[in-house]
């Protein structure tokens, strides 16, 4: 139960940072392109890589990993988890599965979003 609490609290922090980042991007560059989301995905992926590498080198508790990686970075951007999964497959030498994962995740998510839009718009 404590581990879940760590993820929930970290996720709330990450989501709050994501919201503030998006609002800042809207004020700076306007709403015509998703600059905030793109920045969040890139920065979150960089931060995840940095954190995981430091954790692997110096060691760290599962609780710290859950709070920071799953919680904060997961709340900030799930793209960081996606990027870490891709990198893990790649570093294991599973190149084809890594690209299959990336392709299926991105295309599958976009198709699922359009299906959700279609379904919601079809409801009376």
UniProtKB/Swiss-Prot annotation:
Nucleotide-binding listed as a keyword: no
Record's subcellular location: Cell inner membrane
Entry's Gene Ontology cellular component terms: plasma membrane
Disulphide-bonded residues: none
Activity regulation, per record: Na(+) is not transported, but it plays an essential structural role and its presence is essential for fluoride channel function.
Sorted UniProt keywords: Cell inner membrane, Cell membrane, Ion channel, Ion transport, Membrane, Metal-binding, Sodium, Transmembrane, Transmembrane helix, Transport
Major localization listed first in the record, in broad terms: membrane
Reactions performed catalytically: fluoride(in) = fluoride(out)
Membrane topology reported for the UniProt record: Multi-pass membrane protein
Matching InterPro entries: FluC (IPR003691)
TM regions (residue ranges): 1-21, 35-55, 66-86, 99-119
GO molecular function, one term: fluoride channel activity
GO terms classed as biological process: cellular detoxification of fluoride
Binding residues annotated for Na(+), in chain numbering: 74, 77
Family the UniProt entry places it in: Belongs to the fluoride channel Fluc/FEX (TC 1.A.43) family.
Role noted for this protein: Fluoride-specific ion channel. Important for reducing fluoride concentration in the cell, thus reducing its toxicity.
PANTHER family: FLUORIDE EXPORT PROTEIN 1-RELATED
HAMAP family, alphabetized: FluC
Protein name as it appears in the record: Fluoride-specific ion channel FluC
Originating organism: Mesorhizobium japonicum (strain LMG 29417 / CECT 9101 / MAFF 303099) (Mesorhizobium loti (strain MAFF 303099))
């Amino acid at each position: 139960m404590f581990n879940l609490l760590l993820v929930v609290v970290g996720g709330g922090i990450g989501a709050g940072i994501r919201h503030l980042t998006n609002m800042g991007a809207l004020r700076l560059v306007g709403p015509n392109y998703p600059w905030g989301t793109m920045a969040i995905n890139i920065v979150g992926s960089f931060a995840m890589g940095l954190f995981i590498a430091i954790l692997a080198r110096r060691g760290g508790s599962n609780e710290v990993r859950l709070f920071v990686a799953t919680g904060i970075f997961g709340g900030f951007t799930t793209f960081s988890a996606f990027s870490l999964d891709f990198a893990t497959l790649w570093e294991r030498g599973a190149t084809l599965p890594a690209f299959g994962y990336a392709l299926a995740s991105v295309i599958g998510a976009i198709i699922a979003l359009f299906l959700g839009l279609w379904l919601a718009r079809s409801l009376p």
